[in-house]
């Protein structure tokens, strides 16, 4: 059976285009040629699809809220968990779920899962090289001691030669990095650097000390640590900190699979659709880690609502809850007096189009049997057949 024949059979089907394409590809891949068998598969797929559709008038938002909220009451309040790697902590459980729905700009424990391309993923040495290129290195991380020398009126840095070697750096590299960031005179005595300023004073030296410690030497900003872990037949990197844009530029990184738990960062770098998928994945993973199962369609409902305006918005008074069109709905959620005062001053009119506002005024809601109107001809006469 050819693709054209399948397309003709599926032409009038109620199945969505993506499902039609996947079904056609599966039938062709399995080499099914018997027409009766193909017809039966299409019929069964259509029946299964129709069974998954929502009944008209179903309160999908309420059901989604219940389905996520009820298992949420069983989630632990534990903030940290060892994610298979003893050295790294990530936020899980209820605190992580709150972070996701609040659309926090920065998670409490940002982390990345970095996959390597075919050339690097099977070789430990190459994976280690990529990790070194990613891990952020500053002056403090390659020094044994950084302190103010009161006698010589300078900042003294004692470099650790082993740390320099392991990170692929030399003393001249450190000197060059310091000079590019600060105007200082540097005296070099093997692994000891003396940094002098024009008008030395204890206050001036102490003010510069934290800046000297933080000078970036190598790697990706914000990536404090990178752990290498072998899973099945490939090496995967786990990072403490997140900077997906710069990590994508590192040689050896597979940009098609690498991800981060920072949803706002995904939105900024990869777009709103990627952020939507990340919300669904992160919520599902957080619930799954606690042994809880929630139908993905409930999670998709939340993700769609958060991303509907093209930017990730929190669910709460500072996001979706505070932007409802209805004044009464906004007032019923939080900050009741503030919303009612504001609406009164501006002369707003509530159209009573939603659920909450109709319940407040005692009208039937447009849900379930309330969303159906009975239409009848006014000229109908008793005894006359319709």
UniProtKB/Swiss-Prot annotation:
The keyword DNA-binding is assigned to this record: yes
Keyword Transcription applies: yes
Q: Which CDD domains match?
A: RNAP_A (cd06528)
Can you list the GO cellular component terms from the UniProt entry?
A: cytoplasm; DNA-directed RNA polymerase complex
Q: Where in the cell is it found?
A: Cytoplasm
Please list the GO biological process terms of this entry: DNA-templated transcription
Q: From the UniProt record, which GO molecular function terms apply?
A: DNA binding; DNA-directed RNA polymerase activity
Q: Where is the signal peptide?
A: none
The EC number(s) attached to this protein equal: 2.7.7.6
Which keywords does this Swiss-Prot/TrEMBL entry list? Answer: Cytoplasm, DNA-binding, DNA-directed RNA polymerase, Nucleotidyltransferase, Transcription, Transferase
Q: Which residues form a coiled coil?
A: none
Catalysed conversion reaction: RNA(n) + a ribonucleoside 5'-triphosphate = RNA(n+1) + diphosphate
Similarity annotation:
Belongs to the RNA polymerase beta' chain family.
The record's note on quaternary structure and interaction partners says: Part of the RNA polymerase complex.
Briefly state the protein's biological role. DNA-dependent RNA polymerase (RNAP) catalyzes the transcription of DNA into RNA using the four ribonucleoside triphosphates as substrates. Forms part of the jaw domain.
Protein name, please?
A: DNA-directed RNA polymerase subunit Rpo1C
Name the source organism. Answer: Methanococcus maripaludis (strain C5 / ATCC BAA-1333)
Query: Which gene codes for it?
Result: rpo1C
């Amino acid at each position: 059976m050819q693709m054209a024949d399948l397309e003709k059979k599926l032409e009038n089907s109620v199945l969505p285009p993506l499902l039609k394409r996947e079904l056609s590809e599966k039938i062709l891949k399995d080499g099914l040629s018997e027409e009766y068998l193909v017809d039966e598969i299409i019929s069964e797929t259509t029946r299964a699809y129709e069974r998954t559709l929502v009944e008209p008038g179903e309160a999908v938002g309420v059901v989604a809220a219940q389905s996520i909220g009820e298992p949420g009451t069983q989630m632990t309040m534990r903030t940290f968990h060892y994610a298979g790697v003893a050295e790294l902590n990530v936020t899980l459980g209820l605190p992580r779920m709150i972070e996701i729905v609040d659309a926090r700009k920065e998670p409490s424990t940002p982390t990345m899962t970095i996959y390597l391309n075919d050339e690097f993923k099977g070789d430990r040495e190459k994976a280690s090289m990529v990790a070194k290129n990613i891990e952020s290195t500053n002056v403090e991380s390659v020094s044994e001691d950084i302190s103010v020398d009161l006698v010589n009126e300078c900042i003294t840095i004692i470099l650790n030669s082993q740390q320099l070697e392991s990170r692929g750096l030399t003393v001249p590299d450190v000197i060059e990095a310091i000079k590019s960031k600060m105007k200082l005179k540097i005296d070099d005595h093997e692994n000891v650097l003396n940094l002098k300023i024009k008008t030395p004073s204890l206050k001036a030296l102490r003010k510069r000390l934290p800046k000297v410690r933080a000078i970036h030497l190598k790697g990706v900003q914000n990536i404090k640590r990178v752990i290498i872990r072998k899973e099945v037949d490939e090496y995967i990197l786990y990072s403490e900190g997140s900077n997906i844009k710069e990590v994508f530029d590192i040689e050896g990184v597979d940009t098609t699979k690498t991800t981060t738990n920072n949803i706002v960062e995904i939105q900024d770098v990869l777009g709103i659709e990627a952020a939507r998928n990340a919300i669904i994945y992160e919520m599902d993973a957080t619930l799954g880690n606690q042994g809880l199962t929630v139908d993905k369609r409930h999670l998709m409902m939340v993700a769609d609502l958060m991303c509907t305006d093209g930017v990730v918005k929190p669910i709460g008074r500072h996001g979706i809850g505070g932007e409802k069109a209805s004044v009464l709905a906004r007032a019923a959620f939080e900050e009741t007096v503030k919303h009612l005062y504001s609406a009164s001053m501006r002369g707003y009119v509530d159209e009573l189009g939603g659920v909450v506002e109709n319940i407040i005024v005692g009208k039937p809601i447009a849900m379930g049997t309330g969303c159906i109107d009975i239409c009848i001809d006014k000229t109908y006469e008793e005894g006359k057949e319709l």
